[in-house]
Amino acid sequence: MDPYKYRPSSAYNTPFCTTNSGAPIWNNTAVMSVGERGPILLEDYQLIEKIATFTRERIPERVVHARGASAKGFFEVTHDVSDLSCADFLRAPGVQTPVIVRFSTVIHERVSPETVRDPRGFAVKFYTREGNFDLVGNNFPVFFVRDAMQFPDVIRAFKPNPKSHLQESWRFLDFCSYHPESLLSFAWFYDDVGIPINYRHMEGFGVQAYSLINKAGKARLVKFHWKPTCGVKSMLEEEAIRVGGSNHSHATQDLYESIAAGNFPEWRLYIQTIDYEDQNNYDFEPLDTTIAWPEDVVPLRPVGRLVLNKNIDNFFAENEMLAFSMSLVPGIHYSDDKMLQARSFAYADTQRHRLGPNYLQLPVNAPKCPHHNNHHEGFMNFMHRDEEVNYFPSRYDACRHAEKYPMPPNVLSGKRERCVIPKENHNFKQAGDRYRSWAPDRQERFVNRFVEALSDSKVTHEVRNIWISYWTQADRSLGQKIASRMNARPNM
């Protein structure tokens, strides 16, 4: 469907305003009343329609990633990866695919400043010839918890206090004190990269492990990495306070104005891959979202480039109604990553809540390739259909099964149970390695930020001691520094 054909504001270039039903309006500045000073008439359909439309303009904001900005462009394959995936949009170097990208903060509300310390979202929708592929990630390569059952809780812990609506560090420090696997995420969160200078200078990571399948049916685990060609840049607290105090939409403005000026943001896509049969040969768990795949063990491989060269035409239509739902295409599949599998339900479900069951009919979300199924009717269904057969199979309809494409061939066995990921030996190691890789001044800023969080008056001695113990296990000198600032003794 061509979205521009149905725009009531300019589709037919009418010289005057009309009602939603198309009737001409001869006075759009005064209500219908009994005389000049009399009461308004209930029959003033024009007023009722105008007010009713206004009071319904807002839709539910996203439960996470509410604050965001979008832009359009293309993805181009630059390196041959046909040995890894049979995905059509990755078939050969030079192939271009239209995309729309949404950047966001994670925790804060729709109108919050873009200078807050918060993970950033980096979501890409590829409009491929075989359907849409949604690659939804963050600017950190890891997450705070490894099991999907804990996802709602960690988000609530970072959200404002439900009683006061104040965001308080004691809440997420309390929750994450039960999760030492969160250390590496905190080593990103309280690092300098915790406040990107804008969206153009921000990395992106798929976080979870997906699966790539080639034409021969060989499957590999894969992680995706977006690297900005203009480099990674961040803001320190003083600059964030100054910038946020004068412009709470600085990153959105920077993205929009850069594209308008022809300074198109660009990222390079890299992947890491692990053969399915080699998953258990590493000392880390490849399906654990709280750890990173070491690049010296699993090297990066270049794939392509992402260029954003067009601003969106309407913020509501192409940002607020833009919906990512973990869509897949042949050649790319989910892995057994517990967080990824839960997200495959959560993303689509929250879009049904925000936008209705037919959210994929909205122009920004609809595939650009031919598509057909028997998903009929429902709220806000605006697709015109005149077929008589809405079931499958039928001898009156030529629709048939598509050609079979390869799927991950893993064979599963085990008993039904609730259990934890067994390999937890990297809870502390990678966080310590990251801390030790920083220059002394960067280490000092990290210590100051974490000590400030621990200094919340509602953080108990027990929680403080737990965190000092965690950081001591990551790096003894780091634990000692935090303990010294808190007038406590580090315990192993």
From Swiss-Prot:
Active site as annotated: H65, N138
Which Gene Ontology terms of cellular component type are present? peroxisome; plasma membrane
Swiss-Prot/TrEMBL keywords: Heme, Hydrogen peroxide, Iron, Metal-binding, Oxidoreductase, Peroxidase, Peroxisome
Where in the body, by tissue, does this protein show up? High levels in green cotyledons, mature leaf, stem and green hypocotyl.
**Which cofactors are required for activity?**
heme
The record's annotation in Gene3D superfamilies points to: Catalase core domain (2.40.180.10)
Q: Reaction catalysed?
A: 2 H2O2 = O2 + 2 H2O
Q: Does the keyword Oxidoreductase apply?
A: yes
Q: Which GO terms describe its molecular function?
A: catalase activity; heme binding; metal ion binding
- A Pfam family: Catalase
What's its top-level EC category? oxidoreductase
The family database entries (InterPro entries) matched by this protein are listed as: Catalase (IPR018028), Catalase_AS (IPR024708), Catalase_clade1/3 (IPR024711), Catalase_core (IPR011614), Catalase_haem_BS (IPR002226), Catalase_immune_responsive (IPR010582), Catalase_sf (IPR020835)
Give compartment(s): Peroxisome
Q: A single GO BP annotation from the record?
A: hydrogen peroxide catabolic process
Sites where the protein binds heme: Y347
Q: What does this protein do?
A: Occurs in almost all aerobically respiring organisms and serves to protect cells from the toxic effects of hydrogen peroxide.
Family note: Belongs to the catalase family.
Q: How does it assemble?
A: Homotetramer.
What is the protein's given name? Answer: Catalase isozyme 2
